[in-house]
């Protein structure tokens, strides 16, 4: 193979790997979103309606009970399906790592880790600033209360 042909093959290989990784990311994002959404809706459905006037008769209560019960069962099944898909994704990732270039993945993982560390650092600074602001406000509020209100026993 000539130099140009090797470069084209390497470029094509990198593009293919990038597409596969993007597909893995999409699958991961979709399955995690499905887990979160269904869990949220199960928790929402588990809330008890305190308004007894909403049901004029016993049939309305039973209808709502069975509707919610079936909805929760379906959502639980969707969570199981998403979990199963995540297990398959893990297997596919292991297979991909065994069969493909480790250097490319290592580079992408290190890049993602550095982005995460940068984001974490920024969020930590933001949290510290907010913590300081809240502490200052609380201190000023306590001083104001102490100066203006006499709390004697």
UniProtKB/Swiss-Prot annotation:
GO terms for cellular component: mediator complex. The keyword Amino-acid biosynthesis does not apply. Its main location: nucleus. GO terms for molecular function: transcription coregulator activity. It is found in: Nucleus. InterPro entries: Med22. Keywords: Activator, Nucleus, Transcription, Transcription regulation. GO terms for biological process: regulation of transcription by RNA polymerase II. The keyword Nucleus applies. Transmembrane segments: none annotated. Component of the Mediator complex, a coactivator involved in the regulated transcription of nearly all RNA polymerase II-dependent genes. Mediator functions as a bridge to convey information from gene-specific regulatory proteins to the basal RNA polymerase II transcription machinery. Mediator is recruited to promoters by direct interactions with regulatory proteins and serves as a scaffold for the assembly of a functional preinitiation complex with RNA polymerase II and the general transcription factors. Component of the Mediator complex. Belongs to the Mediator complex subunit 22 family. This is Mediator of RNA polymerase II transcription subunit 22. It comes from Caenorhabditis briggsae.
